[in-house]
């Protein structure tokens, strides 16, 4: 469960620092890849909500688990807490619906992403990120077809992204070893 909050916080940090919290500022060709649930989460965020997410994301190392992080969020904004819980429950239900092989793959991805989190004051190690992406791709390719199909059915927007030719070109150039 803690890993799901980290993913939500990561989404929050990325959205807070890269995307200016306005769906209208996202290029049209990328909007289709954003899950409706994520769009809905960010759709009506206030400036105060965005600031709360930034603040809590910057303190991620101080939270012992997901419940502690959610409690901190609840103390800052009950409305935002409710929205975060709704999004968390949506993600949890999707993961819990998977068969063991697919669930193990998703859990492994989440653990790998968590391991990439830099120490306080440190920057993300891009080479470690690239290697993690290569490892995940290799593990995905090694899955049997039934598991791949289950993942595609459960996470259709992710499938759209990874099968998009433009995305593949960008990812391939990013993942090339220096």
From Swiss-Prot:
Residues 1-16 form the signal peptide. Binds retinol. Also binds the fluorescent fatty acids 11-((5-dimethylaminonaphthalene-1-sulfonyl)amino)undecanoic acid (DAUDA), dansyl-DL-alpha-aminocaprylic acid (DACA) and parinaric acid. Binds long chain fatty acids, with highest affinity for arachidonic acid, linoleic acid and oleic acid. These long chain fatty acids can act competitively to displace bound fluorescent fatty acids and retinol. May compete with host albumin for fatty acid-binding. Keywords: Coiled coil, Glycoprotein, Lipid-binding, Retinol-binding, Secreted, Signal, Vitamin A. Gene3D superfamilies: 1.20.120.1100. Residues 67-89, 122-154 form a coiled coil. It comes from Onchocerca volvulus. Glycans are attached at residues 44, 75, 157. Localized to the adult body wall, in particular to the lateral chords. Found in the epithelium of the uterus of adult females. It comes from the Eukaryota. It holds the Pfam family Gp-FAR-1. This is Fatty-acid and retinol-binding protein 1. InterPro entries: Gp-FAR-1. Its main location: secreted. N-glycosylated. One of its GO terms (cellular component) is extracellular region. GO terms for molecular function: fatty acid binding; retinal binding; retinol binding. Belongs to the fatty-acid and retinol-binding protein (FARBP) family. It is found in: Secreted.
